[in-house]
A protein has these predicted regions:
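Predominantly soluble domains enriched in secretory-pathway, periplasmic, or organellar proteins
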Residues: 11-15, 19-344
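Bacterial N-terminal signal peptides that target proteins for export
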Residues: 1-8
């Protein structure tokens, strides 16, 4: 090896990547393509993309903001959604569902007019919401209440409320009759029968701790759990065995698996997007850590364009701690909320 080759290898190792294959290199080069300012100065949480119908749904400022995924223009707002968290959409039924953390309900809205259709009582801190095709149910995971609310979208009535053995975070459906959920307080993943809502398995994520974001490779039965101790844990969804762990940024809140490129993304509140390649179901390679912006911890992926969407806002200095509020949060600077578009 010549001196230049030795220097290049040492430089790559120092950056924490090691030798990068040609396939991995094809996943590199994500960058911020565009920043889109959006109105409102309140809090924000999850966002999701309807790639087929070209819509981005963003929970923000006691509402759901609806963005055209091509023009990136605000085209509508679902108003009066207090403390919004998650959104799921059912295009065939023409309606969407948004969780309202306080008082704890689900707002049903029309996908064309964005008007409220009904409000369904759930539990306090109604947070994550998903649709399971196998059972035909809409399911919420209610963090502080440590339970799950199951809704029949045909009637928009609650079928049952299920207690969980810990505070739930992000959940996914395998489309084959099972749900998987991160239990943040227990550092475990639970497997749930989607029809009966009975827990069939409970698996520790160690060495991962305090999991938040969760996504799944449906074909290869792999779960990707983003944990707050800066690890992405890859788990075999058949037997609960930890396949591999990889380093990610701080304050993760979202992960996504793109089957077309075999890429896992982890959106981190420290202002990074970790990109990982699935070389095989049992081998994963860290590709890059893309600089984003502080607070951009939730994400959505557009399967049509390959773009990653993140939301964030600038924050001021933290107020002086008091006895009543020993850890005051930094307040959002008015007029700074925006959507980040990342791609190659």
């Amino acid at each position: 090896m010549n001196k230049f080759g030795a220097f290049l290898l040492l430089s790559m190792l120092a950056c924490g990547f090691g030798a990068v294959s040609a396939q991995d290199a094809g996943n590199r080069g994500y960058k911020i393509l565009q920043k889109v300012s959006l109105p409102g100065d309140g809090g924000f949480d999850f966002l999701t993309v309807d790639s087929d119908n070209r819509r981005i749904y963003i929970t923000h400022n006691n509402s759901v903001q609806v963005i055209d995924a091509d023009t990136l223009k605000l085209i509508g707002t679902v108003d009066n959604v207090p403390h919004p968290h998650g959104v799921v959409f059912l295009p065939d039924m023409g309606k969407g569902y948004a969780t309202s953390g306080d008082p704890g309900s689900v707002i049903v809205f029309d996908l064309k007019t964005f008007k409220h259709l009904s409000e369904i009582s759930a539990s306090k801190d109604a947070d994550v919401i998903i649709y399971d095709k196998a059972s035909g149910h809409v399911v919420t995971f209610d963090g502080d209440s440590k339970n799950s609310t199951v809704i029949d979208p045909a009637t928009d009535k609650v079928i049952q409320t299920v207690d969980l053995p810990g505070a739930p975070e992000v959940a996914v459906s395998d489309g084959k009759g099972y749900l998987y959920d991160n239990l943040e307080s227990e550092s475990k993943i639970i497997k749930i029968d989607a029809q009966t809502m009975k827990i069939t398995k409970s698996w520790p994520l160690a060495p991962g701790a305090s999991p938040s974001g969760l996504s799944m490779d449906l074909e290869n039965n792999r779960l990707f759990s983003g944990c707050h101790n800066q690890l992405l844990v890859v788990m075999n969804a058949k037997n609960g065995k930890v396949v591999q762990t990889l380093p990610i940024g701080k304050s993760v809140d979202g992960t996504y698996f793109d089957p077309a490129s075999a890429t896992i993304f982890s959106s981190n509140g420290d202002g990074t997007l970790t990109v990982i390649h699935e070389d095989s179901p049992n081998k994963y390679t860290l590709v890059e850590n893309v600089q984003t912006e502080e607070g951009a911890k939730t994400m959505a992926f557009d399967s049509k364009t390959g773009h990653v969407f993140l939301t964030t806002a600038q924050r001021g200095e933290a107020p002086t701690p008091t006895k009543e509020d020993p850890k005051p949060k930094r307040k959002i600077i008015p007029g700074t909320f925006h959507l980040l578009v990342l791609g190659k």
